[in-house]
A protein has these predicted regions:
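Conserved loop-to-helix interface motifs that mediate assembly, gating, or partner/ligand docking
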Residues: 85-106, 110-113
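Conserved helicase motor core of SF1/SF2 NTP-dependent helicases
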Residues: 41, 103-231, 235-323
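Compact, well-ordered interaction domains used in eukaryotic information-processing assemblies
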Residues: 25, 31-34, 38-40
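Short amphipathic alpha-helix segments
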Residues: 12-29
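Hydrophobic side chains in well-ordered alpha-helices
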Residues: 16, 23, 54-57, 242-245
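Short glycine-/aliphatic-rich beta-strand segments at the starts of folded cytosolic domains
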Residues: 1-15
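Interdomain "pre-motor" coupling segment immediately N-terminal to P-loop NTPase/helicase cores
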Residues: 36-95
């Protein structure tokens, strides 16, 4: 069977095919078809079902190209997963969702349907708990939402914090050199802020007190009004720490809690506060629980494969335990 797709501009074809035709080769390999570009048309040949799936994938990628975005391998693999699930039409939902503009003028957008739902939860709810594997953009998108709220004067401060169990953090115990110890653990937050604001603007807001980046234990005893609070990597908080963090919320504030329950560094006899919070707060009004999956990973494709392999391994182990 042969299907044809019209290409209006040469730039579309260049973007769609990718460097050394790698994007099209990936679709050919996935759906067992051949794709050629002749006289302003894409010609797709293969078995009927395979050809129809490949055409759906190509049309979805053209939707991405038409909105002026470069087509990457990650785009192609994500579109393929949507086509396999019969959800390729949902790619158009991502076209208008600009969260904020980076310091270099780049629009920050959700790249997957899961990320879109996550951002919608952040905007709708007072507290959002985002749970998912590494590389799903949990913290980065939360920082983007915080910067957008700050620029629109919806909040006066952005507060970012994360635990540092490896640095010896305990409630009520703050070693004098804790800040220097936890700086490496706060680096992902710094990087996201630098990308959104630029180093100079970040430093200016930091000096004014509009931005605060601090270890988790510094939050104790405070009430945080008019703030956008991000608690990152919260799988490493104890249940007591999590409750302490949640009760810091003040008036006109919003809180986002992110974590990956597969990367817990707490002692074996301690329950993760994040796990408990998801169970306890799932039905509380004003709190959104958003679960991202390996399909939402926007890092190197190998990261997605590794996450899936570990998930399959854990699922197999749990199945054996049940037996």
């Amino acid at each position: 069977m042969e299907q044809r797709i019209s290409i209006e501009r040469m730039e579309q074809a260049v973007n769609l095919f990718g460097s050394f035709d790698e994007n099209v080769r990936l679709i050919e390999s996935e759906f067992k078809v051949t794709i050629s570009n002749r006289e302003g048309e894409l010609r797709v040949n293969g078995e009927v079902e395979d050809t129809m799936l490949a055409v759906k994938a190509l049309n979805a990628l053209l939707t991405i190209s038409n909105r002026g975005e470069p087509i990457t391998e990650q785009n192609v693999r994500y579109v393929i997963s949507l086509v396999r699930a019969g959800q390729e039409d949902r790619i158009s939902e991502l076209t208008q969702d600009v969260i904020c503009i980076s310091s270099k003028g780049r629009p920050i957008k959700p790249k997957t349907i899961g990320q879109k739902k996550y951002i919608e939860s952040v905007l709708k709810n007072t507290i959002t708990i985002g749970v998912g594997p590494a590389g799903t953009g949990k913290t980065y998108l939360a920082v983007a939402a915080a910067v957008a709220a700050f620029r629109e004067r919806k909040v006066n401060r952005i507060i970012l914090t994360r635990p540092a169990v490896e640095a010896g953090e305990r409630l009520g115990f703050l070693p004098g050199d804790l800040q220097s110890k936890v700086d490496p653990y706060l680096r992902p937050l710094y990087d996201a802020l630098f990308d959104m604001l630029g180093a100079e603007t970040y430093q200016k807001y930091l000096e004014r007190g509009n931005i605060e980046v601090a270890p988790l234990a510094y939050m104790r005893g405070r009430t945080l009004d008019d703030s956008f609070i991000i608690l990152a990597v919260e799988q490493n908080t104890s249940c007591e720490q999590m409750k302490m963090c949640l009760t810091r919320l003040g008036f006109n504030s919003k809180m986002v809690i992110t974590g990956d329950v597969t990367q817990i560094d707490l002692p074996a006899d301690k329950m993760s506060g994040l796990k408990q919070a998801v169970r306890v707060l799932k039905d509380v009004e004003g709190i959104g629980i958003c679960e991202l999956t390996d399909q939402d990973v926007v890092r190197h494709v190998m990261v997605q494969r590794i996450i899936k392999a570990y998930a399959d391994y854990e699922a197999a182990r749990n199945e054996k335990r049940k037996k």
